[in-house]
Design a protein with these regions (language model features):
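Glycine-rich phosphate/adenosyl-contacting loop at the front of the ribokinase-like
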Residues: 1-59, 64-68, 233
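Ribokinase/PfkB-type carbohydrate-kinase core domain
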Residues: 1-9, 71-84, 96-223, 283
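Conserved phosphate-binding/catalytic region of the ribokinase-like
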Residues: 3-4, 164, 168, 191-289
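Short glycine/proline- and charge-enriched loop/turn segments
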Residues: 21-29, 177-179, 224-227
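Small-residue (primarily alanine) positions within well-ordered alpha-helices
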Residues: 44, 148, 183, 260, ...
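Gly/Ala-rich phosphate-binding loop of Rossmann-like dinucleotide-binding domains
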Residues: 48-49, 149, 252
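Hydrophobic residues at beta-strand termini and immediately following loops
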Residues: 57, 105, 226-227
Length: 289
């Protein structure tokens, strides 16, 4: 596989509500949808739909949710590299309001270990790109970084959620893809200072996502603003995952970082015009056409 993604996977449920909870308020959902998910899992589907050859590695329990995760990957043409472990598969509840905004609660479930990553060495060694997020435990993350370095594999780190333990690994990534708040946490600045700090950021390549405003592509001190396509959002859940998967797919297709970033921003713009996550990921023909 050209792209290996290691991340969290589990079952996701999507209740749709008119507005988010006020204190002590009980809400009644007017719609309910369920599908497998997780940041890395979503990124894998996005990359595969953009034409990449993808393998996804995650941990699941010996339960129906774990089986559903593997089955959907196969349906999307993705190679599932699942570690089946004692315990429950991860679970997420994504509440979406009528504006398309969301609130997410995650139960992490069973977790990958460093030993699980060791079992993936052959797949990592043969990959051209490795995509990681710190939603997996640090020992597994560290071992994946070590194996990528050993075999000369480029690593893209999507530092979401941003946690302090990820900081020592950022310098070894080929590219970082934080959102605005994660970039501010990385650089120790306020949002209004972000662009000035990015101009002298220590990392040579960053793609900072700005939600509906698009993204900032930073290379060797040069910064380019990439506007998002103007759309009416239906559901913003998974837009960042879409962008990361599409970015990696286009890098593997031979695009420069800036070229890949422009197409990734377009893919993310298209994704928010549709409900839910996996079904919202655009196909390569939609983005390239």
């Amino acid at each position: 596989m050209d792209l290996v993604i290691i991340g969290l996977c589990g079952q996701s449920v999507f209740p749709s509500v008119d507005h988010f909870h006020r204190p002590e308020e009980t809400l009644h959902a007017h719609d309910l949808f369920a599908e497998p998910g997780g940041k890395g899992y979503n990124q894998a589907v996005a990359a595969a739909r953009m034409g990449a050859n993808v393998a996804f590695a995650g941990a699941v329990g010996p339960d129906a949710d774990g089986e559903a995760c593997a089955k959907r990957l196969e349906e999307e043409g993705i190679v599932p590299l699942m570690a089946v472990k004692d315990g429950r598969t991860a679970f997420a509840a994504i509440l979406t309001d009528r504006r398309g905004e969301n609130r997410v609660t995650v139960y992490a479930g069973v977790q990958l270990s460093a030993q699980d990553i060791d079992a993936l060495e052959a797949q990592i060694a043969s990959a051209k790109l490795l995509l990681l997020t710190p939603e997996i435990p640090e020992p597994a993350f560290a071992r994946a970084m070590e194996l990528a370095a050993r075999h000369g594999v480029r690593v893209v780190i999507n530092p979401a959620p941003y946690v302090r333990w990820v900081e020592p690994y950022l310098a070894d990534a080929w590219c970082l893809t934080p959102n605005r708040s994660e970039a501010c946490a990385m650089l120790g600045c306020r949002e209004e200072e972000l662009e000035a700090r990015l101009a002298c950021a220590p990392h040579p390549r960053m793609l900072v996502t700005l939600g509906g405003e698009g993204a900032l592509c930073v290379q060797e001190g040069t910064m380019v603003k990439i506007p998002a396509r103007p759309v009416v959002p239906v559901d913003t859940t998974g837009a960042g995952d879409c962008l990361n998967g599409a970015l990696c797919a286009r890098l593997l297709a031979g695009d420069t970082l800036l070229e890949a970033a422009k197409k990734a921003v377009l893919a993310a713009s298209l994704s928010v015009t549709r409900a839910h996550v996996l079904d919202a990921m655009p196909l390569e023909a939609e983005v390239m056409g």
